[in-house]
Amino acid sequence: MQLKIMPKKKHLSAGGVPLILFLCQMISALDVPLDLVQPPTITQQSPKDYIIDPRENIVIQCEAKGKPPPSFSWTRNGTHFDIDKDPLVTMKPGSGTLVINIMSEGKAETYEGVYQCTARNERGAAVSNNIVVRPSRSPLWTKERLEPIVLQNGQSLVLPCRPPIGLPPAIIFWMDNSFQRLPQSERVSQGLNGDLYFSNVLPEDTREDYICYARFNHTQTIQQKQPISLKVISVDELNDTIAANLSDTEFYGAKSSKERPPTFLTPEGNESHKEELRGNVLSLECIAEGLPTPIIYWIKEDGMLPANRTFYRNFKKTLQITHVSEADSGNYQCIAKNALGAVHHTISVTVKAAPYWIVAPQNLVLSPGENGTLICRANGNPKPRISWLTNGVPIEIALDDPSRKIDGDTIIFSNVQESSSAVYQCNASNKYGYLLANAFVNVLAEPPRILTSANTLYQVIANRPALLDCAFFGSPMPTIEWFKGTKGSALHEDIYVLHDNGTLEIPVAQKDSTGTYTCVARNKLGMAKNEVHLEIKDPTRIIKQPEYAVVQRGSKVSFECRVKHDHTLIPTIMWLKDNGELPNDERFSTDKDHLVVSDVKDDDGGTYTCTANTTLDSASASAVLRVVAPTPTPAPIYDVPNPPFDLELTNQLDKSVQLTWTPGDDNNSPITKFIIEYEDAMHDAGLWRHQAEVSGTQTTAQLKLSPYVNYSFRVMAENSIGRSMPSEASEQYLTKAAEPDQNPMAVEGLGTEPDNLVITWKPLNGFQSNGPGLQYKVSWRQKDGDDEWTSVVVANVSKYIVSGTPTFVPYLIKVQALNDVGFAPEPAAVMGHSGEDLPMVAPGNVRVSVVNSTLAEVHWDPVPPKSVRGHLQGYRIYYWKTQSSSKRNRRHIEKKILTFQGTKTHGMLPGLQPYSHYALNVRVVNGKGEGPASTDRGFHTPEGVPSAPSSLKIVNPTLDSLTLEWDPPSHPNGILTEYILQYQPINSTHELGPLVDLKIPANKTRWTLKNLNFSTRYKFYFYAQTSVGPGSQITEEAITTVDEAGIPPPDVGAGKGKEEWRKEIVNGSRSFFGLKGLMPGTAYKVRVGAEGDSGFVSSEDVFETGPAMASRQVDIATQGWFIGLMCAVALLILILLIVCFIRRNKGGKYPVKEKEDAHADPEIQPMKEDDGTFGEYSDAEDHKPLKKGSRTPSDRTVKKEDSDDSLVDYGEGVNGQFNEDGSFIGQYSGKKEKEPAEGNESSEAPSPVNAMNSFV
């Protein structure tokens, strides 16, 4: 039994109150449980017009349900049908269905008639429709003799079919004797009556087997008419003989074969009438003849043809309108037209109507004492008559029921009792038919029960509707309540819809919709509940779509279709070609998500679709394969897509809108995706933000919107080349205002003064405001107190100052957004603090432990937390040197500060000065500043090693002594006990000699070293020492002089320079670098730095260049041996001049050759003039060159080697020869200038280096 639910009220509130549906007494599409007492209900019956196959048994159905089970009876032709008296008739057990056995004996025609079934129990009786039983008939065609038909080319023709009348009417079609359908066209077609019409005949119409067939579906038989022969001839073939032999009947020559305007073959005349019943298919037909073949047009004179229900059949010769109604009545005109004219025919259509329901009566379940109504409302043309029956008996003669009142098409029940239960029949009839409906009234008292299976699991794809069933029953009618979870969480009206039958609908199911839902049914007799479970699954999506492909014939192509799906659902991928199965060809192969087509052929071109199916959903994507010839083609020009256009907004809702667009040209590269941007003209005009992205195959997008935003949208397309220009903006769409859906972020509470609390937050922007009048509700209260919240509503600002607060007290703070529509959700409280003040108490019990001469450890006791009056940031130590134990360093030094974070109560003081007095104090620090200082605590550092002496200079160098001068260390770090001097010689190969140690009293600042080697370089190491040990050293180098006559070098010392640093960049792979252009006798500080990934590191050292050395050559111009030599040379020159003068005066020649050969001197070679006599008077005895200042050997012979060495030793080298005038080419010590033309010898003093080397 099905009951109708009519909602009276829906109730909804938050905070865990369930969604409640109040229902009255009518329940729709709901069965009364079969274990409850109920009147009969007809569940199955044969059709009203029941045509049977006479060769099979007759089965007349009648099934019903009820409690107790009903009994069945039949009437035939209005009288009781006693099945017990007819051995061929039986009734199925537990059923009212009749079976008439006519296959063994009997005839179907015997059982023709009108049958009606009645199902009855103690609560009432239900009746079936009147079932008209008729056997089907398929009579044979009457035998007839059909003469051949001969027509002139171009004449019209109608081949009659006229099948025998059968039941039901036969289906007509024309075929040849090979059972092939005859071709039809605008010229040749079959009419609705089965005749075959030729608008004009052609020679190709000639054939002898025009056969009309009639198919009778019920008997599955086909009847055949005798074949008709047709011959079409031309005018030339008509001669007198043929014409004489043909009768008028045989020769259809009434109409000329010349061209002619149309005339109608059917229907006849200019007007006709057609009547059709409402809901049927209206078929109008116009077939015309003419030459050329006419074309048919249809119009409705008083209106438009209904576009969705109008169809043209039979080459527009038949107009069909489906599901006709009274509104389709009117005049329809068909127009036949060819080149020679047109003809019209008007068909007047009247639509009548058999009865149809406006409100059919529904079963009614009432509890004792309740009221109810049965309504039976029908319409038709003509208007149907309504009559009531009760339990199959006209209500006028039925037993009277005081709870019942009839009012036309309505029966009103009041204060019903159990005896009021009955089955009522409503009959609506007119001349075109009738409607009969059964509806029971069942009076029950029954507590609620849930009919849906317990713990039913529903699985739904995300973002799709979810329908949770709660079929129920009870009397009185229960109220339905839905809870989420077993304890009942709130159901929001914009998320849930409760249907009349108790079904809960979630229009857009989300992941958070997953869970258990409880349905509760209640009435005054009790309650029942049921739990169902909902699982939300991820949708199946194709994340890699097959792509458009252009391949050459004979090549291979692959399509990929990658699917993303819910992990609990297993998809199956199916490939289709042009929406059909793939060809059964081994060239097509599929593997998981790939389709491969090998040896591509022309027929392989088309649309390939991959479909991923799961048990809950599916997804599809398509790509086009284009097959081209394997000849080279010009390369296409690829570019970014053209912008989309024709943007349109549809389905405009408060929080969503559908955007549709038309893609631009893809410029030979398929579009892979569309990017949608929006502009908020109200809050951020001119600023476009990202909204969504969709695949390149979509042209619509469902966009989620925010309240109170004036949206404009634009779309960009993207392919493998790049992104298109934006489309033109869409029309603007202003969404409705709503309360804010979020609160400000970054809420903080920090005081700036000891008596205030500054509450700050990041304001919402205009897009987040969701409506006009954005404000903030600021609330605060002390965290540890019982105070109520204090609140204030402020304008759209970002801070609020609370004054008069205690110092540094924790507060709970909330900032809630609101606008003219309402409040945002309740925000969570955050903790802040009122303003800080300076700490009140100094750390106590300060202790100092000296670790070594440069390090001390300080300990102190922490201050009480309340005295900090703020966030404890740490402790700060101030320390300073009050005085140094050394007399040299008793000067004021500024205080130094060390801060120790957090709650530490000790710390180390590094970098102290040894042998010094220090003082310190400790202070606590918070966000406001420092507290008072502790009592100063003094301490003393022990002695340490001293620093290097401040300077070191080498003064007054002599042949065997050097004097050192220095300044004491700048930081003695204790009492100096002595100085330590170490030195060692350095030879010409820079090797160091033995090291000599020397201790010097601490009160000295000058010291002379004696008994040193002359002209020797020494390296000195000098440092001071205390009782702790030696300090850093300072180094220096110096050279003793050659002799006392030398010019004393300048003082050499190591001190501080004033020059700026010079920088040289050196390749990182080198390990040395030469410094040039340094000053002699100067100390330099060298710093070498390296920079890499870990940072910059450096080291430095001090070195000193050597002193400028005085020349080790003695001034020979003042030496006695040199003066004597010069006198001898001058005398020799004078003698030579005298000899030359005498010889010239005498003009004689002297034999001096032998003498020259005997005493050949390589230094004095004969240099003859033209007469060959010059040089014969050169006497070796007169030339006495010196060898290192010694006398000539006793044998008075001068060797070449000695002479050469002598001259070279004096700096003249190979140029130390005589000129023609007897003078030296080279000069000693440069005392005499040379002539300009005399060689390249320099007139300057000899090199000090060469002079020094001559003495080594």
From Swiss-Prot:
The gene is Nrcam. Belongs to the immunoglobulin superfamily. L1/neurofascin/NgCAM family. GO terms for molecular function: ankyrin binding; protein binding involved in heterotypic cell-cell adhesion. Residues 1-29 form the signal peptide. The modification Phosphothreonine is found at T1173. It comes from Mus musculus (Mouse). Detected in sciatic nerve. Detected in brain, especially in the cerebellum Purkinje cell layer, inner granule cell layer and molecular layer (at protein level). Detected in neurons and Schwann cells. The modification Phosphotyrosine is found at Y1177. It is found in: Cell membrane; Cell projection, Axon; Secreted. Residues 40-128, 135-229, 261-350, 355-442, 448-535, 539-626 form the Ig-like C2-type domain. GO terms for biological process: angiogenesis; axon guidance; cell-cell adhesion; central nervous system development; clustering of voltage-gated sodium channels; neuronal action potential propagation; protein localization; regulation of neuron projection development. PANTHER family: CTX-RELATED TYPE I TRANSMEMBRANE PROTEIN, NEURAL CELL ADHESION MOLECULE L1-LIKE PROTEIN. This is Neuronal cell adhesion molecule. Residues 1240-1256 have a biased composition (Polar residues). InterPro entries: FN3_dom, FN3_sf, Ig-like_dom, Ig-like_dom_sf, Ig-like_fold, Ig/MHC_CS, Ig_I-set, Ig_sub. Keywords: Cell adhesion, Cell membrane, Cell projection, Disulfide bond, Glycoprotein, Immunoglobulin domain, Membrane, Phosphoprotein, Repeat, Secreted, Signal, Transmembrane, Transmembrane helix. Glycans are attached at residues 77, 217, 239, 245, 270, 308, 371, 427, 501, 613, 710, 796, 852, 987, 1003, 1013, 1067.
